[in-house]
């Protein structure tokens, strides 16, 4: 939908994979701010801060759950990104960086829906931590049947160990 947003997201994922967690958080903040500007279009001037734009979004919100979550995601990205940039010490905070990636993913989904309108294919996309970390699709994308069959097969290969009873 937007090449610049794609590049920002891709770079944030690379930074995370290389364990540059603070830079990842900063990049997701940039992504969130760019999404905000794109949504507001001409209503946001170059002088408006990220806080100003989040307030504009709050003012024009209709009260839907999707809008509320979108604004919360943007605020989280702003807060985490600012904390990483202005921190006095280096923190290897992989969990916060991972949450930033997840929230930026959600913000991108909401941006796509805002730009193109409701789309069940876009709305059904799921964030996959395992894919991000290992490069392989995680079990989150498997059907219940697939998960069941894998567990069943795994149980056949390694039956539970029995303990000897003491008589």
Where are the language model's segments positioned?
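Amphipathic alpha-helical interface elements
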Residues: 1-166
